[in-house]
Swiss-Prot record:
Pfam families: Ribosomal_S3_C
Keyword Transport: no
Entry protein name: Small ribosomal subunit protein uS3c
NCBIfam families the UniProt entry points to: rpsC_bact
Subunit structure: Part of the 30S ribosomal subunit.
KH type-2 domain residues: 47-118
Length: 218
């Protein structure tokens, strides 16, 4: 029987790089991991709280964290010019202060930088967020999946697979539905495949969205 493996972990060191880059003693490792989680949660909560009500869209592709003894460097990769890009200096300063408060580290400076992603809809996190927004607005899940695939094709993705699991359209029995377009060669290590899992809370309960995107071949 085939065993499922996370496509990002499977390709680390070849086509994927680490989202967190730091070294720690084994006894301090769990503490560093919790710190990373806290930083990411704090940034996402801040963006959710301060983004415009009309869009309701975060557009964060990923958050990279690099740590040194005296510095924590956080790079936020965003797809769209949201509030972090527009009121750049003020927004980032406020965000830095918020994150610094969440973990009490006196000896280390925190530096937050913003990087813009070239093709936002080629990023699985942004596509999953788009689908989640559609599902919250009670759009049919099939329609939302097809629209997400169209957007990925416009971003020059070579293949995409979208899967949604849970009580779809409010049905009593939970099920899994998926659509694939193009090639998604999960077993080939040299191909660049991006993946994300995204839970979304709807009026019928929690649904799980998974997206695999085949971007490029090395």
């Amino acid at each position: 029987m085939g065993q499922k493996i996370n496509p990002l972990g499977f390709r680390l060191g070849t086509t994927q790089s680490h989202r967190s880059f730091w070294f720690a003693q084994p006894k301090n490792y769990s503490k560093g991991l919790q710190e990373d989680e806290k930083i990411r949660d704090c940034i996402k909560n801040y963006v959710q709280k301060h983004m415009r009500i009309s869009s309701g869209f975060e557009g964060i592709a990923r958050i990279d964290i690099k740590k040194r003894i005296d510095l924590i460097q956080v790079i936020i990769h965003i797809g769209f010019a949201n509030m972090l890009m527009e009121g750049r200096a003020r927004g980032i300063e406020e965000l830095q202060t918020n994150v610094q408060k969440s973990f009490h580290s006196v000896n280390r400076r925190l530096n937050i930088a913003i990087a813009r992603v070239a093709r936002p809809y080629g990023q699985p996190n942004i596509l999953a967020e788009y689908i989640a927004l559609q599902l919250k607005n009670r759009v049919s899940f099939r329609k939302a999946m097809k629209k997400a695939i169209e957007l990925a094709e416009q971003a020059d993705a070579k293949g995409i697979q979208v899967q949604i699991a849970g009580r779809l359209n409010g049905n009593e029995i939970a099920r899994v539905e998926w659509i694939r377009e193009g090639r998604v060669p999960l077993q080939t290590i040299r191909v660049k495949i991006d993946h994300c899992s995204y839970p979304v809370r709807t009026i019928y309960g929690v649904l799980g969205i998974k997206i695999w995107i085949f971007l490029d071949e090395e």
